[in-house]
């Protein structure tokens, strides 16, 4: 059955196709004979209770100089036989939330939305990991700079980060004796107005921050370890980390087994777990990445696994 695959993403002209997971999904959908539709940025709306989008027919190809072609934009009304790939990057700001609310109406009209709009609203990527405390390192989330400071001092070293960042932005490592600790906490909490996450520093970060992908609740057999370079402690590829594929360890599979069933139950078809050493640190649900790197290193087709699940869901 041929489907209409509607992609909501950041501007397609600015992506780097060698690393872009959304591009891998589009290639796979096109290979299967599905029709691709690109939503104009800001192009979701509600008309008299119906979810609609300004879309253009899209074709994609493995060409770094010219990787897509768009047709003319028209209005599409969401309904059955459609799959919506919600792939906008964080921050999960008010406009992002509004888009998920439009997509919830699309879902009620019969479109299949990946990932589930309600789940995208419910799961902050930093806080969602704490729903599985058996998997996590010691963590404190607070607006209280004094409480956060006490946590850092109690553990010797900690990582401090905002709840709305991505790609390693505004993440600090601090500890006992750091003269900048107070100002870091003042900045992150915005003087006590913003929740900030403090997590015990995990020395295993030197071996990489592992990205484990879940497809329909099941882990891909390989993860991408994002290894910090030089004197950097952040492994994020966006922060200069080097990606190295590895088979999942027994502990990785245990963590995936703790998280996967709940993600599947909530309609989170494609999820990225961040694991450092033996600990889950984040659950990424908005636009997880690393598919292209893992596909290239191990001859995988992870987007194929996703579309197997999508097509099975559409057939039900």
Swiss-Prot record:
GO cellular component: cytoplasm
Listed HAMAP family: GSH_S (MF_00162)
Protein name stated in the entry: Glutathione synthetase
Alphabetical UniProt keywords: ATP-binding, Glutathione biosynthesis, Ligase, Magnesium, Manganese, Metal-binding, Nucleotide-binding
Family: Belongs to the prokaryotic GSH synthase family.
PANTHER family from the UniProt entry: GLUTATHIONE SYNTHETASE (PTHR21621:SF4), RIBOSOMAL PROTEIN S6 MODIFICATION PROTEIN (PTHR21621)
Species for this entry: Xanthomonas campestris pv. campestris (strain ATCC 33913 / DSM 3586 / NCPPB 528 / LMG 568 / P 25)
Domain ATP-grasp: 124-311
InterPro entries cross-referenced by the UniProt entry: ATP-grasp, ATP_grasp_subdomain_1, Glut_synth_pro, GSHS_ATP-bd, GSHS_N, PreATP-grasp_dom_sf
Reaction it catalyzes: gamma-L-glutamyl-L-cysteine + glycine + ATP = glutathione + ADP + phosphate + H(+)
